[in-house]
């Protein structure tokens, strides 16, 4: 395992966002099945694959004394950035500036020392990654409401070690109302596009946790999917370089899309309610209600679990309590698989 981990580090050779200097990776099978310590008093155990928690970086894995100053490039871009630039939380590597409006300061640079650039984690086009939200096209008032919920302790995570969510309530909530309005107006003005390829399958690549997401082992090995969603980058190097044109593939159990469609469109004989009632035709949103079509299925499952556990307690989330109360993990997987397969 250590040889595989070392080879993985050498193959990728990239600094990660957040806390680790070297790429920390570990086999999913070696993690506890919650992805980290649970929050107290939970109704639903959080699945590890939806709350991918970085393992501690081993001392032998650290490369603090190695500074890579070489320029990196991605397809269809004239830009070039160093690995250090692509790992700076207060700097957004803008590979495709023509693909989005000009970024306001809070999106492009954040505000030091604690408010990270919105566009670093959520990407310049807002499409985000499995560990965070896709903000593109969300209603501005909804984005502002979520920031208020983070600030007031009304939005938390079922896994306290899941830092992408924790940092929103600890650091990003320090943004001023003006900064929140600017960021919300920016992201709501971006048209969402397909970002996730959903594939039904019986077997999936074995994965490791790196950078708060699942990545495939190298060399690749396969295992049964079971009751899981395995969402992983289409191209790991481009994803770690923050390329906002390189998306993700979500492996889902065979039959889950059809099962999810039945739950979403009919309510599953009283198990839930038809999602279009609030989320609109095509689940693309309605008024201040967010669209859920084409969004990360890992993210969708996380939100349902957090709602069941009472950790999303804002006004909008309160309306969801009865909607998600009867769902089991298989239902969540099916719903997330179906919604992710839709055009955003």
What would you call each of these model-derived segments?
Residues 31-116, 158-274, 309-344:
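Flexible coil segments in periplasmic/lumen-exposed cytochrome c-class electron-transfer proteins
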Residues 267, 274, 282-289, 296-301, ...:
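Intrinsically disordered, low-complexity segments enriched in Gly and acidic/Ser/Thr residues
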Residues 11-24:
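Bacterial N-terminal signal peptides
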Residues 120-127, 151-152, 188-189, 278-284, ...:
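Detector for the c-type heme attachment site
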């Amino acid at each position: 395992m250590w040889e595989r981990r070392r080879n993985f580090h050498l193959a990728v050779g990239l600094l990660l966002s957040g806390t680790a200097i070297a790429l920390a990776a570990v086999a999913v099978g070696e993690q506890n099945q919650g992805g980290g310590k649970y929050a107290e008093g939970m109704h639903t155990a959080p699945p590890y694959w939806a709350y991918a928690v970085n393992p501690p970086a081993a001392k032998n894995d650290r490369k603090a004394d190695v500074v890579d100053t070489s320029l990196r490039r991605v397809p269809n871009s004239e830009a070039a950035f160093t690995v250090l630039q692509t790992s700076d939380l207060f700097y957004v590597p803008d590979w495709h500036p023509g693909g989005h409006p000009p970024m306001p300061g809070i999106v492009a640079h954040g505000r030091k020392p604690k408010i990270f650039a919105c566009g670093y984690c959520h990407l310049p086009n807002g499409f985000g990654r499995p560990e965070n939200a896709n903000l593109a096209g969300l209603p501005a008032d909804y984005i502002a409401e979520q920031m208020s919920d983070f600030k007031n302790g009304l939005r938390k995570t079922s896994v306290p070690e899941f830092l992408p969510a924790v940092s929103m309530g600890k650091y990003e909530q320090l943004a001023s109302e003006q900064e929140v309005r600017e960021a919300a107006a920016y992201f709501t003005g971006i048209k969402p596009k397909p970002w996730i390829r959903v594939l039904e399958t019986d077997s999936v690549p074995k994965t490791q946790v790196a950078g708060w997401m699942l990545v495939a082992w190298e060399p690749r090995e396969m295992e049964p999917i079971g009751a899981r969603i395995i969402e992983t980058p289409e191209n790991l190097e481009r994803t770690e370089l923050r390329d906002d044109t390189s998306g993700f593939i979500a492996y889902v159990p065979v039959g889950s899309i059809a099962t999810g469609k039945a739950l979403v469109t009919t309510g599953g004989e009283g198990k839930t309610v038809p999602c279009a009632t609030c989320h609109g035709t095509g689940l693309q949103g309605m008024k201040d209600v967010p669209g859920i079509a084409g969004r990360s299925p890992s993210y969708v499952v996380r939100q349902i679990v957090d709602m069941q556990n009472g950790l999303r307690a804002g006004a909008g989330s309160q309306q969801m309590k009865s909607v998600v109360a009867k769902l089991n993990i298989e239902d969540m997987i099916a719903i997330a698989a179906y919604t992710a397969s839709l055009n955003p």
